[in-house]
Amino acid sequence: MRPGLSAKRLVVKVGSAVLTGERGLDLEAMAEIARQVAALREEGREVVLVSSGAVAAGMRRLGLKERPKDMPKKQALAALGQPLLMAFWQEAFAPFGLPVAQVLLTAEDLSSRSRYLNAKATLRALLDLGAIPVINENDTVAFEEIRFGDNDQLSARVAALVEAGLLALLSDVDALYEEDPKKNPQARPIPEVESVEAVLAHAGEENPLGSGGMKSKLLAARIAGRVGIPTLLLPGKRPGVLLQALSGAPLGTYFHARRRYRGEKAWLFGLLRPKGELVLDRGAVRALKERGASLLPAGVKEVRGRFSRGEAVRLLSEEGEEVGVGLANYASEEIARIKGRRSAEIEAVLGYRYTEEVVHRDHLALKEEA
């Protein structure tokens, strides 16, 4: 059996296309998902739901047929719809005696180490209490998050947050295909993906893999895979699909994962959104990989992007290969001034010195580490 299919804890993301029908939210679809989750609970598994549908619920409440295009109205509909969405989930799980708990997050909430740890503790407590956490984007305050596919990536970060053994994406597509099945009915599904990176490398604008919805799912699989969590992309409208797939039925597309990261390194490598990039010389790359050293200013060749002290940065080799992710001890403007210099020169250049390292090894996750 594929790794993760027997996981004790899994995150299930339910997309808007699965939850909605011609008249807004599809209550029968929600009931079917609740039935499957309840069956998993009977097996002794823990399930965290990431649910879209707040905007659709708001549209249903107001009798709107067309989704608005301007952001304030989308956010207003999300505010109207979120309590209704939770009420529908409560109704769906009521026959099984399972309580549901609302948790609203944005990806930025997980970028703060203290908020990340608080969210982690709360979700663990909810699972210990036997509740079904239902997580959604906090759409009314998260401007960038109301766009197609973002809950895919949020679900991957939630999977890392709760240390799930599997991420299941319930979608309106059957699987990842070699070609667009709408254009070519003979297009073949891809049952397994060993390297999401390789698929993403070919997901250009003219490639069906590069379309907004599918690319977001690939990015989610990459985020989860980076911290050792495999991903299943499944046709969410199919009755019993989750139970069947977890029993080993060849459904959807299975994305393999790398070796697992733990603790702060999982947070660094899987949950943070790097604000910039540092290009390192070959000596610095060797020092990080072979000696577990910290990154000193002498090893930095180039600074890309703008970031503040304490924010995450991606570390790259001169050839453009990712080396790791770390927390910067200096802002981008400061590193640009001290790059290539010895640590002893920092104070002379800046007029002050926080630390001798640009990134300390304790706050650094290398790509090959596990």
From Swiss-Prot:
**Matching SUPFAM superfamilies:** Carbamate kinase-like, PUA domain-like
The principal location of this protein is: cytoplasm
Q: Which reaction does it catalyse?
A: L-glutamate + ATP = L-glutamyl 5-phosphate + ADP
Q: Please provide, alphabetically and separated by semicolons, the GO molecular function terms listed in this UniProt record.
A: ATP binding; glutamate 5-kinase activity; RNA binding
Residues that bind ATP, according to the entry?
K13, S171, D172, S211, G212, G213, M214, K215, S216, K217
Signal peptide positions are none
Q: In which pathway does it act?
A: Amino-acid biosynthesis; L-proline biosynthesis; L-glutamate 5-semialdehyde from L-glutamate: step 1/2
Q: Where located? A: Cytoplasm
What's any one GO cellular component for it? Answer: cytosol
Q: What Enzyme Commission number(s) appear in the record?
A: 2.7.2.11
User: Could you tell me which residue ranges the PUA domain spans?
Assistant: 275-353
Biological process terms from the Gene Ontology for this record are: L-proline biosynthetic process
Q: Which of UniProt's keywords are assigned here?
A: Amino-acid biosynthesis, ATP-binding, Cytoplasm, Kinase, Nucleotide-binding, Proline biosynthesis, Transferase
Q: Where does substrate bind?
A: S52, D139, N151
Q: What EC class does the entry list?
A: transferase
Q: Fetch the HAMAP family from UniProt.
A: ProB
What does this chain do? Catalyzes the transfer of a phosphate group to glutamate to form L-glutamate 5-phosphate.
| Family recorded in the similarity comment | Belongs to the glutamate 5-kinase family.
Q: What is this protein called?
A: Glutamate 5-kinase
The organism encoding this protein is Thermus thermophilus (strain ATCC 27634 / DSM 579 / HB8)
